[in-house]
């Protein structure tokens, strides 16, 4: 399966929701603001929008520390707002690309909270853990450090970028 033909010539407009149009006066851009500006974006010659992370997050890293991939961050709106954005964009012949963060989650994600428990459970292996509390993961290319001493589980967990972003285990097949 190759690249879709529409992707060869599309022009995307990248949107960081927080700094886009604020429609409710709280000082933070939101999905309704993006919906209001779809005609403007289309008039610029853009055929799609690339939406930076918009999911529930504690926002230690601008939303790249996702706590719930199934819920829009309340500061940006609701899941219904996101559905409306897709609908309105598609009505205008525009594509919507969501910025997915597949390498890590937030330490506040439910998977990670369960993974931190000393008792083995279905989430134990979803993150990159070692039983060696002093492991620095230098032999793993994309790992930038580790976090330790914060849970009932022995050892430490690898992180991507910041200490609030535990690395997901790509070797976990489920």
Q: Which residues make up each language-model segment?
A:
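Acidic/aromatic-lined carbohydrate-recognition and catalytic surfaces
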Residues: 2-173
């Amino acid at each position: 399966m190759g690249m879709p033909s529409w992707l060869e010539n599309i022009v995307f407009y990248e949107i960081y929701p927080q700094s886009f149009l604020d429609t409710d006066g709280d000082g933070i851009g939101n999905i309704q603001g993006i919906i209001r500006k779809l005609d403007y974006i289309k008039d610029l010659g853009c055929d799609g929008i690339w939406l930076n992370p918009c999911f529930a997050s504690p926002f230690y890293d601008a939303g790249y520390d996702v706590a719930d991939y199934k819920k829009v961050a309340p500061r940006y709106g609701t899941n219904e707002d996101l559905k409306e954005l897709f609908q309105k964009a598609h009505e205008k012949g525009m594509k919507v690309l969501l910025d997915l963060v597949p390498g890590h989650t937030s330490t506040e994600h439910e998977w990670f909270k369960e993974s931190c428990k000393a008792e083995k459970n279905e989430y134990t292996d979803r993150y990159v853990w070692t039983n060696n509390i002093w492991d620095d993961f230098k032999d793993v290319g994309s790992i930038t450090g580790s976090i330790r001493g914060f849970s009932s589980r022995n050892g430490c967990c690898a992180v991507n970028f910041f200490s609030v972003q535990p690395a997901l285990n790509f070797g976990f097949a489920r």
